[in-house]
Design a protein with these regions (language model features):
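N-terminal pre-triad scaffold of radical SAM enzymes
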Residues: 1-32
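Short secondary-structure boundary micro-motifs
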Residues: 1-4, 48, 118-119, 128-129
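Conserved Radical SAM active-site core
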Residues: 4-5, 12, 32-113
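Glycine-centered flexibility motif
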Residues: 10-12, 21, 63, 90, ...
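Hydrophobic pocket-lining residues within nucleotide cofactor-binding pockets
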Residues: 22, 71, 125
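Auxiliary Fe-S-binding modules of radical SAM enzymes
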Residues: 56-59, 89, 98-151
Length: 151
């Protein structure tokens, strides 16, 4: 899943922050979205239900990756999305963010999201540290943190 919103200070990402933040419906509450879209459409409760069903109906899928933009741009919507995906699919969740793990731990609004992420790839993409030989990350300052190993 791609979340298109970026912090204004982030540069060098392949996808610019061009889409507006729109609401998604999560459970009984309307929550400001992270800007998640499916084929350019806002992620609604109906679409998310279909995505969950497709994930659960596909035996070859073993995980979900959330990237962007930055998924942590709107932590309240991210938490609702992660909770729903994790609880209803029980899949391994990877998440890419420009924030560092340490800064997320210190942030009371973003920290709860970490409970639903199995693997976090943290740190901003830095063009001067780009290395095409790296697995699962774009620049050498980014770390792959297997959070589920410590729960």
């Amino acid at each position: 899943m791609f979340t298109p919103r970026l912090s204004p200070t982030v540069s060098g990402y392949a996808m610019p922050s061009i889409w507006p933040v729109v609401p998604i419906i999560a459970g009984d509450a309307t929550i400001p979205a992270v800007g998640v879209r499916l084929a350019g459409e806002p992620l609604t409760e109906l679409i998310l239900s279909r995505i969950v069903a497709e994930i659960n109906d596909n035996p070859i899928l073993d995980g979900i990756t959330i990237s962007g933009g930055d998924p942590f741009y709107n932590p309240f919507a991210l938490l609702a999305l992660l909770r729903r995906l994790k609880e209803e699919t029980h899949k391994n969740v990877w998440c890419y963010t420009g924030y560092t793990y340490e800064s997320l731990l210190k942030d009371e609004t973003r920290r709860p999201c970490l409970d639903y992420i199995d693997t976090l790839v943290d740190g901003p993409f830095v063009q001067s540290l780009f290395d095409p030989a790296l697995s699962f990350r774009g620049s050498s300052n980014q770390r792959i943190l297997h959070l589920s190993k410590y729960r």
